[in-house]
């Protein structure tokens, strides 16, 4: 799978040259590394792109506003829908992800946002138990 080969190349670069030791220490409990076999074994890979600008009929460039926010919200809704349908998901964001433009033949004005891995988890799948803050810790109510 060309996506796996390219993603693992970026991940190798990240783990060996880009990431600080502090970042690597934070990732250690999750057991992540440059090997991404799930990119081949998953039922589905969904490449999500955002489009920072478009062109009008005259070929003039037009800025698209709030693309990261819009795509982030839409992706969250998709993940929630998949989970409600019993499908496991994993967000994967190798950086940079421009290799997806080439492999998937997407135009340069589109920027990869996220690679969403979806499918039915294997028996060996490890889902980390990451503690979340309580709502009262992150919410302020104004009367």
Locate each region found by the language model.
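Glycine/small-residue-rich phosphate/adenosyl-binding loop
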Residues: 1-71
């Amino acid at each position: 799978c060309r996506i796996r080969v390219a993603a693992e190349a970026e991940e190798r670069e990240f783990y060996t040259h880009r990431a600080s030791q502090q970042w690597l220490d934070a990732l250690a409990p999750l057991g992540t590394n440059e090997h991404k076999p799930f990119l081949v074994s998953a039922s589905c890979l969904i490449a999500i792109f955002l489009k920072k600008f478009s062109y009008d009929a005259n070929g003039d460039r037009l800025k698209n506003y709030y693309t990261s926010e819009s795509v982030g919200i839409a992706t969250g809704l998709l993940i929630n829908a998949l989970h409600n349908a019993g499908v496991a998901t994993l967000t994967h964001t190798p950086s940079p992800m421009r290799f997806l433009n080439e492999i998937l033949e997407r135009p340069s004005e589109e920027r990869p946002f996220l690679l969403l891995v979806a499918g039915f988890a294997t028996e060996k799948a490890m889902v980390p138990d990451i503690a979340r803050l309580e709502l009262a810790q992150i919410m302020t109510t104004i009367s």
